[in-house]
Amino acid sequence: MTFLRPLAALVCCAALLALAGCIASTPPTTAEVGVLYSKGTGPMPMLLATDQVDGYIAWQPFVEVAPLAGIGKVIAYSGDLPPAGRWKNHPCCVLAIRTDLAAQNPGAVNAVTAATILATDYLQANPDESAEIVADWLAGKGDFTYGNITVSSVAVLQRAFPTVKFVNEPTEPWKNGQVEFVHALRDLNTLTGSLQNASDTEIRGILFDTQPYTAARAMIYAGRITTPPKVTRKLGIGYLMSDHDAALFVAVKKWQYFNDTYGVALRPQDPSKTRPDLVDLIVNGQKVAEIALVPGDAGPQLMQLAATDAVQFAYVGNPPTIAAIDKGTPVKIVMALNLEGSGLVAAEDSPAKDWPTFVQWAKDRSAAGKPLKIAAPGKGSIQDVMLRYALRDSGLSVKEV
């Protein structure tokens, strides 16, 4: 994804929204769209079904819930939102690791990183099976239920998977996106710590430690994972109940395959559990560490767990990770987990069927004095940013409701 450099000027002048996370006040235009912050994605299907909103922008798998439940239709996936090509391959979730663990137990950190990379490679090659694994983890392969809305978890995940790009390599364009995100958050006055006045070079040093990724990839290419010294304390991996964290779920559920094929595995202590909460890190047949798997409601909660050393690894979105690092949480971003994976949904009975017709619907409703109300997970979320930028590009203003 290509990010624009002059974010400060854009925000200060309120001429544009900065691409990698900036939320700016939108100047009045002829047509207006209301944005409602729903404090996460969980409430969105019910809000749409009960006509409290006209649509929502969310991460997967919530995008696919609406069409399968018959309450909405997908207007655009995040990579296709306007301006054309601007959001292609936009960054999303990352693997963040506490710096003290990486310094004290680099071998164990490299092994967990390798397990994640191998699981990502596996789910890229086996998307249908991986979708079922995620559905099993999230809902026991049963139904997702939101109030009186019930949909098959397997069907939802099978639709969602093709819209998420599961990747790990911390490329230079990907890093540049994170740096620009820091500039945007700085302009919002949300960064008050180490990132507030840092140069771009300093930002990179503060945010990233890609050595575990490099070491893990090297071991995978060499065909042997190095057995690290045993870790004497229990470790923790924080994660979100989202298909964006599919690599973790696949690594645990397919542990035998990874153990037999590559010599590294996250072996569940109780394989009968749909959602294991304890795993053993196994390298070349040896138990290296016991790891608790800790689900969180949102990224900030996971970063709080990391700050208190309750977890040492986090599968988490980049906005809360950057904010936590700025405040002094001792973590570094090691690699990507996925790109894209969000989408805009509109009510099933709406006249919108794609972005141009959505814009026309918004203009018609605004002219009639009944502006559309679209739910977003939270102010400053990447979904909020993409929606605001797309609306602005189409000549629509935003009002928080």
Predicted regions and their residues:
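Conserved C-terminal helix/tail region of periplasmic/extracytoplasmic solute-binding proteins
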Residues: 179-234
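Secondary-structure end/capping motifs
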Residues: 103-192
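A conserved helix-loop-strand patch within extracytoplasmic ligand-binding domains
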Residues: 24-53, 60-62, 67-103, 336-401
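Paired acidic/hydrophobic, glycine-rich loop segments that form the ligand-binding mouth/hinge
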Residues: 54-59, 73-75, 292-295, 311-317, ...
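Short, polar/charged alpha-helical segment
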Residues: 241-290, 295, 300-301, 307-308, ...
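Short helix-initiation/N-cap motifs at beta->coil->alpha
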Residues: 32-50, 59-62, 269-304, 317-319, ...
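C-terminal motif of bacterial Sec signal peptides marking the signal peptidase cleavage site
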Residues: 19-21
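Bacterial N-terminal signal peptides that target proteins for export
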Residues: 1-10
